[in-house]
């Protein structure tokens, strides 16, 4: 019996998932929320060493549309985040996740928005860049933006913003312990890229559902650019 047609988005997502598990982006771990659903991913983000996010374990979800990669996925933090470019809902305000339409009112260039040549790897790199370098122009969280600017302008003397971040980082340790996750705390640990273990029999069957034999082959914020801001620790 002929196999049913598989949407091209499933094939694209499977290739990306395997690639990210075999060669992870530093500071990230991606898995499926449900093994039978390629359109919903769980993302674990580890806070980069030598920043105020160091030691943090932040959980997020990536939800892909059926026409991916022609439309962007949605990225939402499950962990409570205090950041100028993250809404209270956890949704990230970043240009790369916006559909490729020409909207002069947005303050974004079309080239800053999503296009089909981009992928999950570029999204993850954009997210970690945004965490460390917030864009405070028309922010998603105004209060966080005001606090961040005070911290920046005081050269780190006003610590209200960073104190909130450190408190949130400490709070993520409970999630890490519950999930059995060892959070990297040194640059050496953070930069180690480990390949995913070989798939078991069940996983082979899962992959076979999407591919015929031999078929598998080898950040701007949402409101436009501004001067670089840094989330790294200052003396």
Curated annotation (Swiss-Prot):
UniProt keyword Nucleus present: yes
Entry EC number(s): 2.3.2.23, 2.3.2.24
GO cellular component entries: cytoplasm; nucleus
Residue segments, region Important for ubiquitin transfer: 98-113
Gene3D superfamilies: Ubiquitin Conjugating Enzyme (3.10.110.10)
Catalytic activity: S-ubiquitinyl-[E1 ubiquitin-activating enzyme]-L-cysteine + [E2 ubiquitin-conjugating enzyme]-L-cysteine = [E1 ubiquitin-activating enzyme]-L-cysteine + S-ubiquitinyl-[E2 ubiquitin-conjugating enzyme]-L-cysteine; S-ubiquitinyl-[E1 ubiquitin-activating enzyme]-L-cysteine + [acceptor protein]-L-lysine = [E1 ubiquitin-activating enzyme]-L-cysteine + N(6)-monoubiquitinyl-[acceptor protein]-L-lysine
EC top class named in words: transferase
Single biological process term from Gene Ontology: proteasome-mediated ubiquitin-dependent protein catabolic process
Regulation acting on activity, per entry: CDC34-catalyzed polyubiquitin chain assembly activity is stimulated by the conjugation of NEDD8 to the CUL1 SCF E3 ligase complex subunit.
Active site: 93
Post-translational changes noted in the entry: Phosphorylated by CK2. Phosphorylation of the C-terminal tail by CK2 controls the nuclear localization.
PROSITE patterns: UBC_1, UBC_2
Keywords, ordered alphabetically: ATP-binding, Cell cycle, Cytoplasm, Nucleotide-binding, Nucleus, Phosphoprotein, Transferase, Ubl conjugation pathway
CDD domains from the UniProt entry: UBCc_UBE2R
Localization, UniProt: Cytoplasm; Nucleus
Similarity comment text for this entry: Belongs to the ubiquitin-conjugating enzyme family.
Domain UBC core residue range list: 8-174
Protein name (database record): Ubiquitin-conjugating enzyme E2 R1
Comment text on domains: The C-terminal acidic tail is required for nuclear localization and is involved in the binding to SCF E3 ligase complexes, and more specifically with the CUL1 subunit.
One MF term in the entry's GO annotations: ATP binding
């Amino acid at each position: 019996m002929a196999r049913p047609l598989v949407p091209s988005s499933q094939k694209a997502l499977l290739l990306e998932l395997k690639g990210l598990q075999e060669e992870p982006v530093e500071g990230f771990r991606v898995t499926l929320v449900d093994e039978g659903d390629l359109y919903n991913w769980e993302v674990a983000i580890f806070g980069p060493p030598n920043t105020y996010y160091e030691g943090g374990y932040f959980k997020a979800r990536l939800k892909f549309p059926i026409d991916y990669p022609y439309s962007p996925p949605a990225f939402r933090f499950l962990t409570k985040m205090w950041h100028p470019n993250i809404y209270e809902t956890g949704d990230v305000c970043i240009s790369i996740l916006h559909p490729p339409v020409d909207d002069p009112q947005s303050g974004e260039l079309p080239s800053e928005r999503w296009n089909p040549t981009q992928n999950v790897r570029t999204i993850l790199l954009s997210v970690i860049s945004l965490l460390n370098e917030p864009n405070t122009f028309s922010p998603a969280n105004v209060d966080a933006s005001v606090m961040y600017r005070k911290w920046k302008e005081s050269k780190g003397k006003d610590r209200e913003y960073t104190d909130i971040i450190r408190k949130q980082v400490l709070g993520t340790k409970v999630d890490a312990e519950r999930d059995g996750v060892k959070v990297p705390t040194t640059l050496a640990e953070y930069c180690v890229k480990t390949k995913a273990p070989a798939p078991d029999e069940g996983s082979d069957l899962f992959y076979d559902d999407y591919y015929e034999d031999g078929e598998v082959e080898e950040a701007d914020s949402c409101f436009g650019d501004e001067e670089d801001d840094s989330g790294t620790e200052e003396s």
